[in-house]
């Protein structure tokens, strides 16, 4: 089998298995995590010695996590293990814990044989290009040193962050739970057999949605279809929308940092307009600037500009 290991400024990703330089396996993981820990120790701006680790529901997740936990504690860091969690939840946990960094174990929308390590700073944000390059340099040079027996870290399991994240959403001024309850929405969801299945239903119930039609919510990591949320992979939920007479459908990728919205007629609401629609709502209540990524459409700019006269 052809194995792949891709090293980039945003982390490492690869197919599980292979020789140390050819796949994502324990030796590759140890080297890279030790380099990240060395980088954090030299550069962190916070006093704590904690790093948060969360993962999606990939089959390889438990193995990768054990190697990551062992390496971080071997480098002298205490690890807050939040286990199965969405990428945004792990990012939130870093700041809530006052941690000096975080590692997310997910290959996002890649197929099940892939996994990856995504690296966060103390703000719960991804490392920038220069920081990522420095981690790669440390890894290549093996310029790291493990802790002695009196300075090993410990693992701190913490299963509270799913609920903390849901509560932080409910506490947002712009989230009108009463309006959602009153609408009596019928909602279909497809969570592609990963961590969306353990958080999206609970979030919807907390928002007052009573009728949820679930597809692939068991988080076993054997993805029921190609996990990238694009139209050709979403035929099943489109069919369900009609049978269930659902008002809206939501599809997430394995680590829940991508969202596809399905309209009541079963067609996909164009992904690049999701941000535009949300921005329109936010700006109508709190006018101001928006920040976009390179894949955002011009429509976001147009919506933002339309509110500048208010």
Positions of PLM-derived features:
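Gly/Ser/Thr-enriched, mixed-charge loops and adjacent short helices
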Residues: 15, 115-244
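Short, surface-exposed alpha-helical segments at coil->helix boundaries
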Residues: 61-66, 132, 197-201, 301
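Conserved small/polar residues in nucleotide/adenosyl-binding loops
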Residues: 308-309
């Amino acid at each position: 089998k052809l194995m792949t290991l891709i090293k980039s400024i945003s982390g490492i990703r690869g197919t599980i298995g292979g020789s140390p330089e050819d796949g994502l396996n324990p030796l590759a993981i140890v080297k890279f995590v030790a380099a990240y820990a060395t980088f954090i120790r030299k550069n962190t701006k916070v006093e704590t010695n904690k790093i948060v680790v969360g993962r999606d529901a990939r089959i390889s997740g438990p193995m990768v996590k054990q190697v990551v936990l062992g390496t971080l504690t071997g480098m002298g860091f205490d690890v807050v293990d939040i286990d199965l969690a969405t990428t945004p939840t792990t990012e939130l946990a870093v700041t809530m814990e006052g941690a000096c960094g975080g590692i997310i174990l997910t290959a996002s929308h890649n197929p099940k044989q892939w996994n990856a390590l995504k690296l966060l700073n103390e703000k719960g944000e991804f490392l920038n290009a220069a920081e990522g390059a420095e981690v790669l340099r440390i890894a290549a040079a093996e310029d790291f040193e493990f802790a002695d027996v009196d300075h090993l870290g410990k693992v701190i399991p913490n299963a509270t962050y799913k609920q903390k994240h849901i509560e932080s959403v409910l506490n947002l001024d712009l989230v009108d739970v009463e309006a959602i309850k009153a609408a009596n929405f019928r909602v279909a969801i497809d969570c592609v057999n990963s961590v969306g299945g353990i958080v999206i239903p609970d979030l919807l119930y907390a928002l007052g949605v009573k009728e949820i039609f679930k597809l692939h919510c068991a988080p076993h990591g054997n993805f029921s279809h190609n996990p990238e949320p694009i139209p050709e992979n979403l035929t099943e939920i489109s069919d369900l929308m009609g049978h269930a007479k659902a008002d809206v459908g939501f599809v997430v990728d394995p680590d829940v940092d991508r969202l596809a919205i399905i309209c009541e007629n079963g067609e996909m609401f164009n992904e690049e307009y999701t941000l535009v629609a949300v921005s329109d709502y936010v700006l109508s209540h709190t006018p101001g600037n928006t920040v976009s990524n390179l894949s955002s459409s011009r429509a976001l700019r147009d919506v933002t500009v339309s509110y500048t006269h208010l």
